[in-house]
Amino acid sequence: MHTLKETAKKHLSFLCETIENRCVGSKGNLAATKYFQEQLEANHWQIESQEFDAFDWESEKAFIETETIKLDAFSSPYSEPCNMEAEVAIVSTVDELEKASARNKILVVKGELAKEQLMPKNFIFYNPDHHKKIISLFETSGAKALIFIVNKSGAYEGGEYPFPVVEDGDFKIPSVYISEETGEQ
């Protein structure tokens, strides 16, 4: 018989290491849901599943390129694709974002604005007002694309880093994210 610690480690290993992507609608999400359902049923739990339509999304290689550097980046889950050239504006606080002249620019987002993942704008279960405000400011900024330099101090201990700040199929501004270390280049 396995100890509780061994059992928990087995489940977490499968859900976090074996399945790398659990974004809603992805093959990994469906595999994780099936695995969880099987574990509950094996322990004689009665379950109900509520099905809903969700689209799958896959990212190709993403990068940020200037005349002098080329940086590998990660596409934000569900991001629209893009290939563009534009001037850059940089913001790190809500106040700077409110005052930014970002129309038709690529907005580099760092600091306070890149320390936590923002809830999807139409997520009804939990969506703090400050997240709604930031998303709204991005959408009304006129920015052509967003580059998030993810704040390492915002990463959860032992969690994914860098992590996507935006993971929202309803958010239509193309975005990528990179680590602070990559952003220093």
Positions of PLM-derived features:
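Noncatalytic luminal/extracellular "stalk/propeptide" segments of secretory-pathway proteins
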Residues: 2, 6, 10-118
